[in-house]
């Protein structure tokens, strides 16, 4: 080396052979040529060439001079760089340059030349590649480690390489760059932050997207150097995350993006960083937490991520953010769930509980995204979501917000179509989600028009897609209908009914538009538009759009003709689709992308277009039924037993025969139905008869061969078929045959002659047949019918107890256990009622006599002869039959007028009967009559007595019934402003006088000033007033107050001279007045109008008499607590199984706002089936929660009563029942007047049978559950058995020395007299009633209230306390239903979270007989 140094010091530069001196004196081209030769020389040299190394040392030094390093020509610079790279290779490990500054200049120079790599198409690229390869292979830059400015050199190199890499480079370029950079990291002592930044910056999303190759280069570098670089990465994140030193790097703001990228590159890079994220998840800074949550969502959710299993503490900490207080964080967590479910099914279990809480989040967007996450995963693969997750979606179909409900419903529909309809995952998957079809249809029970329209759309697109070929579509519908639950079937039937009704409304509108324009037609058109508007979303806008559409129809004949075809009964499915397409095309405007008018009309067209059913469809459906009958169908493959399929198919056809009767008019269809009539299955034959009745109007003229074959079958069914078939056979004859009188005579005569009172088995069908003939043709058989009723029905059947009943302690038994004699008696009562409903007059006093007979049955507890032969369950049945018969007759104006007040009051007591089923079914029939506006308003007052029912859920249902009936009347008055003459019979507030009068005559109300009895009266009054006063519309509070004041100025018309009776009346008025004063702040205002009191109930006010006395005892004041009435739109209780309805929620939701799905103007009693949640989220939010119905009654305390009082009131009934002697058997129907005399004398004495009353339990929940388990073991006999004590009647009310006078028929209320109620309507009602009564039999008998065994209180003077529990089946049929648009039954699968059975808090009244 000494020699070489000498040579260098000599300063003489030796050039390779053939190369002349290279200086600034030669041209650029010559310089390049010479340099190329130098390059070639150095390239060929290796490290072992010591002589050459020494020879060219000065040349090496010369090439590093500023002349070359700063030369303006790039080719010169490139060649010099290649020389220098080879020089470093040849002279390694010692470089010929010793000056640090010179070394820095050289390496910065080489780095600058590397920029030439960028242009891969350059002719010099290979030389640039050589340069890169050389310095990478030799690791030339490692020389710089000793330099002070090494960091600057390395940083510049890294920046250069990252900036030049592009997709034109091959793998070798990439590899050499990685080699070059990795050697610097792996062999150096440290990695500066600046250098680290040059690598990490390429991972930032913005840079990553700009230069994917730089990202790949950084990724490869980090993978190669993971172990060496990890401490520096850790230090960087520690500085930024833990110490907050964001100034150390410009990348501080991208720290979370970097963590994600680094984790994806190599998780080992973050071994020490991930624990720091746990602290960040608990940061107080919302935005910071959000950033960490977003980061971890990507890390945990990535496809192959194992982070959750590797770092469980971090996973648990992350799950905790699902409950974060900051909304965007919770939203982010929920969005992450779908990726996690799809990529990591094993984590579904961990997520389920957190998603459950979030599905009840107060934020709409979060609840919405929970659904989206679950549905997205389910649509990818059903196995990814468990049943719990699907249930969360199911719950949200009842959410308060439409957007959430819609998402949930559409999600379920898509899942159903994919896995059930298209069977994409096999039968097991289809079975798992079989509940979806029922659930979606149950939503049709909702009150919101949006929900119902969406159900219709889902049905047409996802459940039975309308674009399927006809046979396929009908097969789909056939098996769907066969597998739906009963409530879903009712919903589907209602859907078709609503669509059909709307179709008729639109048809009427088109007909009106076609008429010449007059004021009358304009009014009719407006009225029709209003009706149609109510069937569309957003009634305000819909009204404007419908007016516009009406104008379009008037002006555009083509659109009108298309619409006319669409609503025609003969319109086929294909035609319907064409019409809809044409109308929307004509109304559309290409320039207007969003057209709300067109959207609204589309809604209308969707509802009225017959896209499923036409003549071809009915024919295909009949063929499908025939296949099942022949055994050639795929019933078993579809998972439906053949019998069930046939029965469901006929039921489906029956429903369609109501909505699409014209589509049945084909010989093939009628022949198939005729074959069904002859089948053994009673239900199938019944349905076939009903289809004939609905569709057979043209059979006689168009299908004579069908007529000939059908007639003998109908005769046979009417005479000897099962009762229901006999009934339908009579109605078929009435609908089909013009010679019906002849046919009726041929049936009536032989049946009439063959009636045998001793042959019970063969009496029921004749009685049913004769009853329906009497209803349809009362004049044809007037004389024989009157004789038949007087002699046979009354004398031979009702007044005779031929067989002793079975001894049992039960109060109710299933139908099959009822004695044949009682079943005959029930049919005899129904036959009398049908006869009277057919006559529609009381000219022969038959109605009066029948009412006396019915009230006598009620009065005698169902044992008309009072011989004690009838069993208790049979007596219950007869009481129910009598009570129902009176309610039925009261719906006919001519009979309502002759029902005396005593008879009405006695009938009302049926709602407090000791037998639960009697109360339940009677209330059902009462509710139906009221909701159809058939029963007079005074019958709504009977609902007040439901406050005395010991079963909390019965009270809750009664309340819902009241809400519906009040709303029905208010809605009717809104829509029919011109019915002011009916105001007395429709305005709900007018129920108050009837309620006051009924409660004043309540047999429980014995002592005028008795506090306990008055508290009972108060509860009954509040039961009605709470709902009436919920809204103070039109100053109704003042109106009610004025009404009560006016009553105090009158006397009781039932006993105007009875001082005690009048005092009771005034006392009840004072109770009502105190309730009004305590619950209203506007009661003292001027009443909007002077109330009119019913003359049958109250005398005219005496102008000389001013009754200002307060009749209440002073201590009663404390029981009137001030406060506003609860909102009437309490949703949910009526839709739950009775085991949970009415229970108070433990969450804050019970004291927060309750809002229905519908708008505030909609009927609030919709069966929203909204459950009460017992759990609340960690934040007390309630916006999305569903609400339970609190009991209408507050908890009551046990009575304190003197023993003397008790002993006096507990005496057994002392009323003597006059025996019916043999001579009385000769009574005609008119002789029943005598029978009524005793009844009138003791009419006020009969106390209602009371169910066992129970007191509230103050025991803890675990004690309650323990008792529950004990009670479950009790036998059914014990559940239904009457009270253990002897029955206690109520002390008789004093009679004022005579029988009350019968009200003459002329003294009628102002109820409107619709004389002609069609027999068909009556028959339809009866059919529905029979179905509902049948439903009662399908329930478990655990419905009765059972008294638990409690120790008696030792202290004297206290009454016993008993705890009652309702362990009722969730399958029980609810009697009081809310304003379901479908039917009076409501689906009961809506309990979304199980609730514990709570103690029913009801006071035990010692003055009353125990209730069952």
UniProtKB/Swiss-Prot annotation:
InterPro entries: ARM-like, ARM-type_fold, Pds5. Residues 1139-1149, 1156-1167 have a biased composition (Low complexity). GO terms for biological process: cell division; DNA repair; mitotic sister chromatid cohesion; negative regulation of cell population proliferation. Residues 1137-1412 are annotated as: Disordered. It is found in: Nucleus. Signal peptide: none annotated. Keywords: Cell cycle, Cell division, Mitosis, Nucleus, Repeat. Residues 1350-1362 have a biased composition (Polar residues). Residues 1402-1412 have a biased composition (Basic residues). Its main location: nucleus. Interacts with the cohesin complex. PANTHER family: ANDROGEN INDUCED INHIBITOR OF PROLIFERATION AS3 / PDS5-RELATED (PTHR12663), SISTER CHROMATID COHESION PROTEIN PDS5 HOMOLOG B (PTHR12663:SF1). Plays a role in androgen-induced proliferative arrest. Required for maintenance of sister chromatid cohesion during mitosis. This is Sister chromatid cohesion protein PDS5 homolog B. It comes from Gallus gallus (Chicken).
